[in-house]
Amino acid sequence: METAILVAQLCATASLAAWLTIGVKDNILIPSLNEPYTADVMAMVEMEKEYPEAHAHVAHRAITNRTVQRTAFYIVVSMELLATVLLWIGTIALLMALFGTATVDTARSLALYGTTAFTAVWSGMLIVGNHFNYWFSHEGAQNTHYQMTLWGIGTSILIVAGS
């Protein structure tokens, strides 16, 4: 049973690592895929267009300074990169534990650091997005952030419960 649990933990952690690797790679190499949308959320552009009365109550929250918007985007990318590295370290450690070249407790701890960082990235997006009321006009992004948060939590539970 211990081997099956380790395999499940390994696959779940590696899946998070692989998924986030693609995202962070694109954010580094092709920032135009996401950065303008981050700026749009921070400036509350769509909310102002689609829900002007609601926007009037929270318009003071908008950040339109492009330097601040870009800086925020690259802070997020840095956090994604950190989470990706931690996830791959956890994945490698779990693989090593599976083959007896690392302790299971250490491997699970390292994987848990990665899943915690992954979850923090996406829950952070939910929190910041909430500040900018992004549910008014960016439901798809909010849904993705919820799904990623839940995926991270689920993987963390698998690691802890399987200990």
Regions found by a protein language model. Give the residues of each.
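Long, hydrophobic N-terminal alpha-helical segment
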Residues: 1-67
